[in-house]
Amino acid sequence: MRIALGIEYDGSGYFGWQRQAEVDSVQGQLEQALSKVANEPISLFCAGRTDAGVHATGQVVHFETNAIRNEGAWTLGVNANLPDNIAVRWAKEVDDSFHARFSATARRYRYVIYNHNFRPGILRHGVSHYHGDIDADKMHVAAQALLGEQDFTSFRAIQCQSKTPFRNVHSVKVTRQGMYVIVDISANAFLHHMVRNIVGSLLEIGLGNQPLTWMADLLALKDRNQAAATAKPNGLYLVDVTYPEQYQLPKLALGPLFMLD
């Protein structure tokens, strides 16, 4: 039996999604909780491996099991065995053609900037603090250069293991909600650190340090060293993963919860 789950987590206390020896990971915690409920070892496959400090409201995973359990066992039962900063949002049996990573047609991220002179206290792990006068409208205009299938070498991490730098960005918008500036970006897939590297460069435009044409210039240069520093991890959320309609997976509010959809 193959089960898909929708997962939400606060990544601030973990060394990323991927299971690692001797450090705490989201995957490790989930597999441990699922194995207790299934009464057998469980291995997970995810839609997107988030880095240390990065969060998710719409992560999707799947696993194989011989255990026969009702939906409540895979949601309430698993949640009872998880730490408070990880939660299963939904569970659904899927056919063997479904794969959390390879069946996905798009991933969507939101990056939340807290734009204020003073750092936040309560939301310090859930937003990235940047002071100065950030012009979200300029960031939005500049970001449109990212649309379509392009070579994103300038925005990939040096240690990125992808065989190709090409990705297809479906949509990108930058908006302001009071003190928050939100970068919302969707693509078929993302390179390692791609979203945070894009945000880092957009911030330079929003702060008036670079012209509106800079994103297009960076794409043409194909040189990571010419782009801005990587933005902080704590404002980044994986909010949605898109799959073909045939799987009929639940669609919930994107979040994070303190933001307007």
From Swiss-Prot:
The active site is at D51. GO terms for molecular function: RNA binding; tRNA pseudouridine(38-40) synthase activity. It comes from the Bacteria. Gene3D superfamilies: Pseudouridine synthase I, catalytic domain, C-terminal subdomain, Pseudouridine synthase I, catalytic domain, N-terminal subdomain. Substrate binds at Y109. It catalyses: uridine(38/39/40) in tRNA = pseudouridine(38/39/40) in tRNA. It is an enzyme of class 5 (isomerase). GO terms for biological process: tRNA pseudouridine synthesis. Formation of pseudouridine at positions 38, 39 and 40 in the anticodon stem and loop of transfer RNAs. Homodimer. This is tRNA pseudouridine synthase A. It comes from Shewanella sp. (strain MR-7). The lineage of its organism: Bacteria, Pseudomonadati, Pseudomonadota, Gammaproteobacteria, Alteromonadales. The gene is truA.
